[in-house]
Amino acid sequence: MTDIPPAVSPPPGPEIIDALAAVIASRQGADPATSYTAKLFGRGRGKIVQKFGEEAFEVGVAALVESPEQVVAESADVLYHLMVLWADVGVTPDRVWAELARRFGTSGIDEKAARKK
């Protein structure tokens, strides 16, 4: 999924998102021969979107017919590819967290209705 040596991986928890975002950002513009992430960026947004869609589908399939462990593995792939997509369009995790915070405590039905106005 990423090119981070295990020795420098942050501990499990929310801070891993910021660490992964920093690694992903560092791969933008890098030589595609040096990392999978750089290769994805080099292939363009269409390929990034395609990979995200494939991984989202795979987590759905895993939820239907595979083990919880496979759902976890596929979910990590979805998050990684989503974060590559965010980076490609210039969105940081903080912006997504802010939007989630804005919506928190609002009914999903009410939030969706407000978007139609």
Curated annotation (Swiss-Prot):
Reactions the enzyme catalyzes: 1-(5-phospho-beta-D-ribosyl)-ATP + H2O = 1-(5-phospho-beta-D-ribosyl)-5'-AMP + diphosphate + H(+)
Entry's Gene Ontology cellular component terms: cytoplasm
Keyword Nucleotide-binding attributed: yes
InterPro entries to which the protein is assigned, alphabetical: HisE, PRib-ATP_PPHydrolase-like
Leading EC class: hydrolase
Similarity comment: Belongs to the PRA-PH family.
Protein name as annotated: Phosphoribosyl-ATP pyrophosphatase
UniProt gene name: hisE
